[in-house]
A protein has these predicted regions:
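Phosphate-binding glycine-rich/basic clefts of nucleotide- and phosphate-handling proteins
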Residues: 124-219, 223-227, 232
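Internal amphipathic helical hairpin motif
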Residues: 4-58
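Glycine-rich phosphate-binding/hydrolytic loop that grips phosphoryl groups
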Residues: 91-94, 139, 235, 242, ...
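Small-residue (GG/TT-enriched) beta-loop-alpha framework at ligand/catalytic clefts
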Residues: 53-161
Length: 301
């Protein structure tokens, strides 16, 4: 699957009546045309019915069909065969279902911190219920922290230093031993990152509490998500998972760790299978050699 911010995919969730489901596509096209001035011939659309939610029509659309088609053809000409492209919420749902992350019948929350946005996706019973996003991503932190060292270090060097700082030191209320280049103010960076991440958490809480499917839940002791998962470039900021855990009040798992572990298990399984085949082949040849030797001995006698 492929995705690009330049495709400008959008998600919308509509309420439909049972009598309209027979001509669902026409209903969707008409509504998108009225609401967003979308021309169906120049747009990419996918939709599905979700009977577990009041807003049961889940629609993903983009008006950048020509750009998407051009990128597809470029990949094909390069010898690659993309399967599909879609929005971040749909990709997260596919990952959620593929890795069987459903733990119970409760709501699961998937948070994807991209370069320029953070996407928040609500899933229940493997069905996508709602999604929201706000305009804070990894670049939000990098651009602001880079200004701290811009007077003493070259631009690319500053950004590289900020990357290192975010990944290895990250969000912390206490000072750590800092081993980076001279000219980058660690103490100022730590305080700024704490302030920026606090702004991010406030927007995240607002987004979650504005889901229409569930009542405002942040800070309520009687509510717990069935699972909370984070991914994306911004999830590599050290202690970001802990900050989200403290904000939401539920344990947080990293999608990168889950996908890597799953891949390693499959790889180990293949390796074990090959090893067993090899061992069985050696054992077979050993028995066969013994039998051949015994036959020769019998002939000699």
């Amino acid at each position: 699957a492929i995705h690009s911010d330049s495709y400008q995919y959008q998600m919308t969730y509509l309420k439909t009546e049972d009598k309209l489901k027979g001509d669902f596509k026409k209903f969707i096209v008409n509504n998108l045309s009225k609401l967003y001035s979308i021309e169906s011939d120049n747009s990419m659309m996918e939709f599905e019915i979700n009977n577990t939610n009041d807003k049961n029509a889940i629609v993903c659309y983009s008006s950048k069909k020509s750009d998407i088609d051009q990128d597809y053809q470029t990949l094909i000409d390069s010898g690659l065969q993309p399967r599909y492209n879609t929005s971040i919420p749909k990709l997260l749902q596919n990952i959620y279902n593929y890795y069987n992350l459903e733990k119970n019948d409760g709501y699961s929350l998937l948070i994807y911190i991209d370069q320029f946005k953070t996407h928040i996706v609500l899933i229940q019973k493997n069905q996508l219920l709602e999604s929201r996003y706000f305009h804070i991503g990894l670049n939000y932190f990098i651009n602001r922290l880079s200004k701290l060292g811009s007077g003493t270090l070259p631009t690319e060097e500053v950004r590289s230093t900020v990357f290192h700082f975010l990944e290895n030191y990250g969000i912390s209320k206490t000072k750590n031993k800092f081993e980076l280049q001279d000219g980058f103010p660690y103490d100022d960076a730590r305080l700024m990152l704490n302030e920026l991440s606090s702004i991010m958490m406030n927007q995240m809480k607002d987004s979650i509490n504005n889901f229409s499917t569930i009542q405002p839940v942040i800070g309520k002791n009687d509510f717990a998500f069935g699972g909370v998962y984070i991914g994306g470039p911004g999830s590599h900021i050290k202690n970001m998972d802990r900050l989200i855990r403290d904000t939401i009040g539920d344990p947080v798992e990293n999608l990168n760790s889950i996908t890597t572990t799953s891949f390693k298990k499959r790889l180990d399984s293949k390796m074990n299978f090959r090893t067993r085949v090899k061992e069985n082949y050696i054992l077979y040849n050993k028995k066969r050699s013994k039998n051949n030797l015994k036959n020769v001995q019998n002939k000699i006698q």
